[in-house]
Amino acid sequence: MIDKTYLESVCAAQSLPFSPELSEKLDQYAQLLVEWNEKMNLTAITEPNDIAVKHFADSLLLLNALDIPKNASLIDVGTGAGFPSVPVGLARPDLKVTLLDSLQKRITFLETLCAQLSLPAVCVHGR
């Protein structure tokens, strides 16, 4: 579904982690995002190549922008559909990722997503 070659080349050019497992999980993420987006408005970006460029690559580039220590805890306030925290958490499984959003419907999506991707993120609904 997504352009895995593009993501692999972006990650290689930036010395970012990229593996077949990450590629598969990002593809699953894109499929779930498009599927759930038909029921609720999660994102305006739903074309596979756009998801790869504007959601996944942009999120993964954050790993070079920030010096995130090993085993650090991150919180994504207003996470929406999980960007940038879910791709970052998938690329860096040592991180403890907390997802915070004010809408329960988004949290429901994120809990389903994290369960299917085996990402042990903590999802929090708060208002």
What do the predicted segments below correspond to?
Residues 21, 47-50, 98:
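Conserved short-loop catalytic and cofactor-binding motifs
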Residues 22, 29, 51, 76-77:
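Residues at the start of alpha-helices and the adjacent loop-to-helix junctions
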Residues 60-127:
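Conserved SAM/SAH cofactor-binding pocket of Class I
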